[in-house]
């Protein structure tokens, strides 16, 4: 093999290995952010006290107002339910049967949310 062809082949192999290593490092570091939220049925796999996002539908007749700015409710993915406790201002789209994402921690098998995000479908129309 000529020296020029051999050097080109070595350069291509080094570039390919560098790109593969870079992509591996990026995917490893983004592992927890690839999935935006977990459904309630996957929560038992998570250790308590770890910050995470859970999502599902607010179960009908589960909203319980504790104080002026504190509520508890249940979200479901039709497989498992999860109790959520939230203190703060509710999103405008928050209601029973609505999809939500809660950001917070799991403590004593109850999810303590510090932020709620209300989801809507592609046919969103603001409340009139």
UniProtKB/Swiss-Prot annotation:
The keyword Cell membrane applies. Residues 1-8 are cytoplasmic. The chain crosses the membrane at residues 9-29. GO terms for molecular function: heme binding; metal ion binding. Heme binds at residues 120, 124. Residues 30-128 are periplasmic. Its main location: membrane. GO terms for cellular component: plasma membrane. GO terms for biological process: cytochrome complex assembly. HAMAP family: CcmE. Belongs to the CcmE/CycJ family. PANTHER family: CYTOCHROME C-TYPE BIOGENESIS PROTEIN CCME HOMOLOG, MITOCHONDRIAL. Heme chaperone required for the biogenesis of c-type cytochromes. Transiently binds heme delivered by CcmC and transfers the heme to apo-cytochromes in a process facilitated by CcmF and CcmH. This is Cytochrome c-type biogenesis protein CcmE. It comes from Rickettsia akari (strain Hartford). The lineage of its organism: Bacteria, Pseudomonadati, Pseudomonadota, Alphaproteobacteria, Rickettsiales. The gene is ccmE.
């Amino acid at each position: 093999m000529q020296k020029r062809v051999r050097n080109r082949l070595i350069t291509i192999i080094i570039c390919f290995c560098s790109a593969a290593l870079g992509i591996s490092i990026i995917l490893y570091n983004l592992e927890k952010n690839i999935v935006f939220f977990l459904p309630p049925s996957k929560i038992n796999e998570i250790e308590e006290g770890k910050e995470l996002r859970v999502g599902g539908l607010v179960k009908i007749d589960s909203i319980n107002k504790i104080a002026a700015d504190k509520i508890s409710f249940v979200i479901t993915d039709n497989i498992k339910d999860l109790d959520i406790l939230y203190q703060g201002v509710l999103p405008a789209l928050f209601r029973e049967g609505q999809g939500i994402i809660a950001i917070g921690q799991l403590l004593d098998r109850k999810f303590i949310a510090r932020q709620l995000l209300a989801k809507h479908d592609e046919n969103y129309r603001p409340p009139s």
